[in-house]
């Protein structure tokens, strides 16, 4: 069993977190949107994906999946941190990487031991 943090609970992040938890890992899914996290804790899904609601509820109930807004809580004891935050297009058409940058900085500030960081967000080549 691995300890995993997934940052961002949109389509990519929530599906990733739920699937890793269903494989038997302990997953903490983090989002800075307090309302989104509160809704997930109540079982309200922010997106639709066939089977996702059941997957989230089953793994939350088993204790393998939890949700938080706290980087310190989410990163405690984890081996892997997945960044799955939005990268919207800027007015010039380029990817806006501010959320990826903020997540990376927050990981650096709050990690207590070495960990592997995996970026699942869409970013330009060479980023």
Labelled PLM ranges:
Residues 1-127:
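Structural/interface elements that position substrates and couple domains in central-metabolism enzymes
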């Amino acid at each position: 069993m691995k300890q995993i943090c997934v940052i961002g609970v949109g389509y990519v992040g929530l599906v990733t977190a739920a699937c890793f938890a269903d494989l038997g890992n302990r997953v903490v899914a983090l989002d800075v949107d307090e309302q989104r996290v509160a809704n997930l804790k109540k079982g309200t899904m922010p997106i639709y994906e066939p089977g996702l609601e059941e997957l989230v509820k089953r793994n939350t109930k088993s204790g393998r999946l939890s949700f938080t807004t706290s980087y310190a809580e989410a990163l405690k004891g984890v081996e892997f941190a997945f960044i799955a935050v939005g990268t919207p297009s800027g007015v010039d058409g380029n990817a806006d990487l501010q959320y990826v940058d903020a997540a990376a900085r927050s990981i650096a500030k709050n990690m207590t031991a070495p960990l592997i960081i995996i970026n699942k967000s869409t970013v330009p080549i060479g980023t």
